[in-house]
């Protein structure tokens, strides 16, 4: 009597348009040649219900059967997928802070180039208008500061706080200038701290170094989206981010997810 072979369930990737880690996760699985079922929680009527049914609450999620992982950390994702390989080298904390400053300054420049109508209108499949995306760039850095200064767990809600409430005319650039100054001041006081310590986040325990790296590249990816927006309006970006500005950051290949 023959026994039927047991086939493992395929991987599923739960994602949403405009989500930076979602795009990076899908690109990573494709590079590794790993097939997956794509579940866009914004367009699939059952997408969010499926995500919540396995016990998750936000994207990106990589799942297989009843197991899942929040995919913000590539190292955690590799472990979940059973992939070997050396851990990717991170930029030093001082360099990450320098890059974050470049990114925050750039985001403010691009927002200044857009009109009020452009800032507050819908854009492609974006989850927020340009003014909201700009706010999120700065809020990501502010959430990092709040988590390390309190200290407390870095939650998903912290990274999104205030972004959906942004209204036409809100001075997001002024808000961003304040966050940029706060980050610089924090570094002046904390450049000597131990960045190998573990800190709690909504995607699991991570080193402070990992959280700072994610803060930097997460803001950078959304700033790349602002460049796409500016260019789409027929405007030449004021000092576009260069390859040197972004080198060494674990960014997605694409600036905009067109899936």
Where are these regions (language model features)?
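Short, charged, low-complexity loops and linkers
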Residues: 83-96, 164
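Alpha-helical bundle segments that constitute or directly flank the non-heme di-iron/ferroxidase center
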Residues: 92-114, 135-146, 178, 188
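Acidic/histidine-rich alpha-helical segments that form the ligand environment
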Residues: 100-110, 164-199, 206-225
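Local sequence-structure signature of Cys/Sec-based thiol-disulfide redox active-site neighborhoods
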Residues: 2-35
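Thioredoxin-like thiol-disulfide oxidoreductase module
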Residues: 39-57, 81
């Amino acid at each position: 009597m023959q026994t039927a072979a047991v086939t493992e369930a395929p991987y599923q990737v739960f994602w949403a348009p405009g989500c930076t880690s979602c795009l990076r996760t899908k690109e990573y699985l494709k590079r590794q040649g790993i097939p997956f079922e794509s579940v866009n929680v914004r367009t699939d009527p059952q997408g969010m219900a499926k995500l919540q049914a396995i016990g998750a609450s936000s994207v990106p999620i990589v799942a297989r059967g009843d197991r899942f992982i929040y995919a913000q950390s590539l190292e955690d994702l590799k472990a979940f997928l059973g992939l070997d390989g050396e851990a990717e080298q991170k930029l030093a904390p001082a360099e990450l802070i320098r890059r974050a400053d470049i990114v925050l300054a750039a985001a403010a420049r691009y927002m200044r180039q857009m009109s009020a109508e452009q800032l507050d209108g819908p854009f492609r499949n974006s989850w927020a208008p340009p003014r909201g995306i700009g706010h999120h760039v700065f809020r990501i850095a502010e959430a990092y500061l709040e988590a390390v200064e309190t200290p407390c767990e870095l939650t998903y809600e912290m990274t999104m706080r205030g972004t959906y409430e942004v209204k036409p005319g809100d001075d997001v650039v002024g808000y961003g200038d304040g966050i940029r100054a706060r980050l610089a001041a924090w570094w002046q006081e904390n450049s000597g701290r131990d960045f190998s310590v573990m800190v709690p986040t909504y995607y699991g325990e991570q080193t402070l170094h990992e959280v700072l790296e994610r803060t930097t590249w997460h803001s950078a990816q959304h700033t790349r989206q602002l460049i796409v927006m500016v260019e789409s309006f027929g405007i030449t970006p004021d000092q576009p981010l260069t390859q040197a500005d972004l080198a060494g950051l674990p960014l997605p290949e694409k600036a905009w997810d067109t899936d």
